[in-house]
Amino acid sequence: MSSGTLYDKVWDLHRVADLPGGSTQLFVGLHLIHEVTSPQAFAALQDKGLPVRCPERTVATVDHIVPTISQKRPFADPLAEEMLSTLERNCANYGIVLCGLGSGRQGIVHVIAPELGLTQPGMTVACGDSHTSTHGAFGAIAFGIGTSQVRDVLASQSLAMNKLKVRRIWVDGQLGSGVHAKDLILHVIRSLGVKAGVGYAYEFAGPAIDVLSMEERMTLCNMAIEGGARCGYVNPDGVTFDYLQGRFYAPTGEAWHRAVAWWSSLASDPNAVFDDEVMFDAASIAPMVTWGITPGQGIAVDESVPTIDSLEPNERPIAEEACRYMDLEPGMAIEGVPVDVCFIGSCTNGRLSDLKAAAAIAKGRHVAQGIKAFVVPGSEQVARAAEAEGLDGVFRKAGFEWREPGCSMCLAMNPDRLEGRQISASSSNRNFKGRQGSSRGRTLLMSPAMVAAAAITGQVTDVRKLISNTVPSKSFHQ
């Protein structure tokens, strides 16, 4: 009887050769590229006169540097315009599909590939972006790579990799009202630490994972990297197949039925052996907020910033540094901390279900005075779907700005930035110093619903308090 994990199965299927030193040459089934990490890679190919080995397995989009208020060309930022023009030229020269601005398919790379059906179970997926682990939600093995590796994949459609150990993260129970996948992964990272996953792939499993939507699973896998893991994944199941069916690049007809049968066989076997296992109880998890300068410095919204002496000795120096940087006092409640900017979007939480969760909180309310709040859909498809359901109107009426798709304030590569000592409530994935623009800017990570609650109240707020006062509505058009 087979006794392998999904990771073992996908690894073995893509192994090209065993290399000296213990690494493996691994075939890459899907290579996703964007405007930031691809120019140098293409330049290296041109210098050596090399073609792109498998242009049909390479798909490009533009996301990091695009402005979200107006995407009229040429961009005001000449460097951003040059980067996009270079990507357009490289894709045209090498025969690579580009999901460009206005194509109906543009967006954040980790949003568009799943929604187009490009990401499928059993694949190996590589991209020059840290959060490529997102695609593991489909039962793929997906990993971020550097620019030199982007070059290698373009040239050979393969990579030299070391096999990872596998840690299964089993989650029992069900998440409570107002608690989302973002809260679950922040809780996991808080509990295990930001370095616990080094050398591991994380398999997310258990009753709480089984009932998550694909978009929630993507949030979970997206932030596995923040816990130190190289990749995270969920075994493919009926939820996966229902999401993929009918998507542009998904198989059809008899090929679909064959694909589903094969995909089903990839799930980790009941007697699979894991290198490590940890368990969590979903019912015990509350809405989370980061208070510090790493994603591991998170607490439940009804908790307080930890006192220094309550921490392990190795955690104390960075906790002291974080409190100084964030202007927070050890022992103070996180709920009630004032915010300046509220950002809903990113490859972590810029999908339709994320926007719906935030809109449910915003509907019938208004952004607090002095708060800048804006919503950036993760893709053109997400934007159009949200607009069809009236979400843009809900947000605008509540005082939020409704923007064009892009990475936006997740990182400081476009005009959406914090200024000075501003503090943001953000649905993105990293709260490092200066991550969102200003070298002195501060970031509080939380779910989209929690960001919406902060925007309405002007401070960190337990979203469950607003949910209890929300009248259910079947339509955002009402």
UniProtKB/Swiss-Prot annotation:
NCBIfam families: leuC, PRK05478.1, PRK12466.1. Catalyzes the isomerization between 2-isopropylmalate and 3-isopropylmalate, via the formation of 2-isopropylmaleate. GO terms for biological process: L-leucine biosynthetic process. The lineage of its organism: Bacteria, Bacillati, Cyanobacteriota, Cyanophyceae, Synechococcales. HAMAP family: LeuC_type1. Its cofactor is [4Fe-4S] cluster. It catalyses: (2R,3S)-3-isopropylmalate = (2S)-2-isopropylmalate. Gene3D superfamilies: Aconitase, domain 3. The keyword Metal-binding applies. One of its GO terms (molecular function) is 3-isopropylmalate dehydratase activity. Pathway: Amino-acid biosynthesis; L-leucine biosynthesis; L-leucine from 3-methyl-2-oxobutanoate: step 2/4. This is 3-isopropylmalate dehydratase large subunit. [4Fe-4S] cluster binds at residues 347, 407, 410.
